[in-house]
Amino acid sequence: MEPVLVYNRRDIFTKSNLNKLRKEGYIPAVAYGDDIKSLPGYVSKKEFEKLYHQKGLAGKIKISIDGKERTALIKEVQTHYTKGNIIHVDFQILSENKPIYVEVPIIFENAEILKSRGLVLQRQMDTVEIEGLPKDIPEHLVIDLMAYEKPTAIKLKDIKLPEGIKITEDLDEVVAVIDVSEITEEPEVEEKKEETSSNA
């Protein structure tokens, strides 16, 4: 069963109140969507960090507002400029029947097979924007490198998409380049060492 993050309303907006919430183990937040203009609140630091570690930025999660379960995106995460801890979070509440636009990571599978083929992967893109209904949005897109046996350019149009999902960017954009790996000169170095030893 998917965990549900409890979203608590916040009615006090002073800086001292925000600091108090953080000391008590909460993260100040704001939630917004089609039917919610802007709702200040706060969430459990421990529970949010657990979900954030699993889902990442733009990850799709379940949150409970006034006892009603909603689907939301982790839209923005602000961290302290020196300590690095999370100090504020934005959630975008999703409408199940309305398409959304979101950046998702691109994952390369079976990259280790390229080395055995004398090839190397040069990444050009790490994320891509996609469009689809909230229920169809994947956590990431996958490119399987098993089928690549020679140098080539992998483009966005080569990515296999889940049903109901579209890429909003130029499909001719290069995601990664598979190239011939560099040949080392170790044998020549060994020969030079032997020559030096003989001359000595």
Curated annotation (Swiss-Prot):
InterPro entries: Rbsml_bL25/Gln-tRNA_synth_N (IPR020056), Ribosomal_bL25/Gln-tRNA_synth (IPR011035), Ribosomal_bL25_b-dom (IPR020057), Ribosomal_bL25_C (IPR037121), Ribosomal_bL25_long (IPR001021), Ribosomal_L25_dom (IPR029751), Ribosomal_uL5_bac-type (IPR020930)
One Pfam entry name: Ribosomal_TL5_C
Example GO BP: translation
Keyword Glycoprotein: no
Subunit structure: Part of the 50S ribosomal subunit; part of the 5S rRNA/L5/L18/L25 subcomplex. Contacts the 5S rRNA. Binds to the 5S rRNA independently of L5 and L18.
HAMAP family: Ribosomal_bL25_CTC
Listed name of the protein: Large ribosomal subunit protein bL25
Gene: rplY
